[in-house]
From Swiss-Prot:
This is Peroniin-1.1. Signal peptide: none annotated. Keywords: Amidation, Amphibian defense peptide, Pyrrolidone carboxylic acid, Secreted. Its main location: secreted. The modification Pyrrolidone carboxylic acid is found at Q1.
Amino acid sequence: QPWLPFG
């Protein structure tokens, strides 16, 4: 997920 650092 682009808005999460692990996404």
